[in-house]
């Protein structure tokens, strides 16, 4: 931290869903945020990462970068490992050497898909595919360096930006008279804007001091992908599209996805005093922002 109390924060993966929300929040902060994506900093290059972190004098590194294509990871696990593990290790080692605190975003995919109890941070980890394995390896790499770190697992992320389930459903329910959506996979959608606000609150307030560890964050409430799709269509006014529930085995996939992805958020709420909105409220807000952007 500088002598004037201003923190320096490095945000990687700044062009992704979460990174773009952090850009919006960081612009109004008295602290100094530096936003990078692969064009500015290749986090798979250990030397470049170390040089950049040392030169920037960062107090906090927030890693929003990830290889998130679950199916493609099955065909090229090495590529996913490079970004989800090796690059994370580079950031963690730089944080360790410089004394920075690393915030790293992980996933519900580190768990298996069985059971019907919300996942606590200390529950056994058993990823079902390559994506989950590489994300778990990333968590383990952070812990192995011994750096000060806050790991936040999230699930079903969506926003106004990039490609995600909400935007796909908005398009398909506008284009098609009917649609099949799986009902046998259950979780809690996470609006990237809400996750960004939570991270921003923790970072800006210095609430992470002495509270490093693993946390879970998603919006409140539970639904299936079918439920989510129905609510998206309702909120968007796409009532003409009939949405049918179907089994996940009707959509062949290279990797088995978790049937139950509900995360227990008790720890992050109690530790940092966070008030987390219900997924339906945030979904409607996101759709409202998309509609407003279309009108401009």
Regions found by a protein language model. Give the residues of each.
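NAD(P)-dependent short-chain dehydrogenase/reductase
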Residues: 140-187, 192-201
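Amphipathic terminal alpha-helices
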Residues: 279-296
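SDR active-site strand-loop-helix element
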Residues: 12, 36, 61-65, 102-107, ...
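Catalytic helix-loop patch of NAD(P)-dependent Rossmann-fold dehydrogenases
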Residues: 82, 87-90, 97, 110-152, ...
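NAD(P)H-binding glycine-rich loop region in Rossmannoid oxidoreductase-like domains
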Residues: 46-85, 94-96
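Mid/C-terminal beta-alpha module of Rossmann-like enzyme folds, strongest
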Residues: 205-254, 294-295
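N-terminal Rossmann NAD(P)H-binding glycine-rich loop of SDR-like oxidoreductase domains
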Residues: 7-25
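Adenosine-cofactor binding site in Rossmann-like domains, unifying the SAM/SAH pocket
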Residues: 29-49
């Amino acid at each position: 931290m500088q002598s004037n109390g201003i923190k320096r924060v490095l945000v990687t993966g700044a062009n992704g869903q979460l990174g773009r929300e952090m850009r919006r929040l960081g612009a109004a902060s008295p602290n100094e945020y530096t936003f990078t994506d692969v064009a500015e900093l290749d986090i798979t290059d250990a030397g470049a990462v170390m040089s950049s972190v040392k030169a920037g004098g960062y107090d906090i590194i927030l890693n929003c970068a990830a290889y998130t294509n679950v199916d493609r990871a099955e065909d090229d696990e090495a590529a996913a490992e490079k970004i989800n593990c090796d690059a994370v290790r580079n950031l963690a080692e730089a944080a360790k050497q410089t004394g920075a605190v690393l915030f790293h975003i992980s996933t519900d995919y580190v768990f298996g898909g069985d059971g019907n109890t919300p996942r606590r941070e200390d529950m056994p980890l058993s990823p079902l595919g390559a994506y989950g394995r590489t994300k778990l390896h990333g968590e383990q790499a952070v812990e192995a360096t011994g750096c000060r770190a806050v790991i936040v697992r999230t699930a079903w992320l969506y926003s106004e930006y990039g490609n995600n389930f909400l935007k796909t459903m908005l398009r398909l329910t506008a284009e098609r008279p009917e649609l099949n959506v799986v009902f046998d996979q259950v979780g809690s959608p996470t609006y990237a804007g809400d996750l960004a606000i939570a991270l921003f609150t923790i970072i800006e307030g210095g609430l992470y001091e002495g509270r490093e560890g693993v946390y879970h964050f998603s919006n409140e409430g539970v639904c299936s992908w079918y439920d989510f799709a129905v609510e998206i269509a309702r909120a968007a006014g796409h009532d003409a599209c009939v949405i049918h529930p179907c089994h996940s085995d009707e959509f062949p996939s290279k990797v088995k996805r978790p049937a139950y992805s509900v995360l227990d958020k008790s720890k992050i709420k109690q530790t940092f005093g966070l008030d987390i909105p219900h997924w339906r409220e945030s979904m409607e807000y996101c759709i409202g922002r998309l509609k407003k952007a279309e009108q401009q």
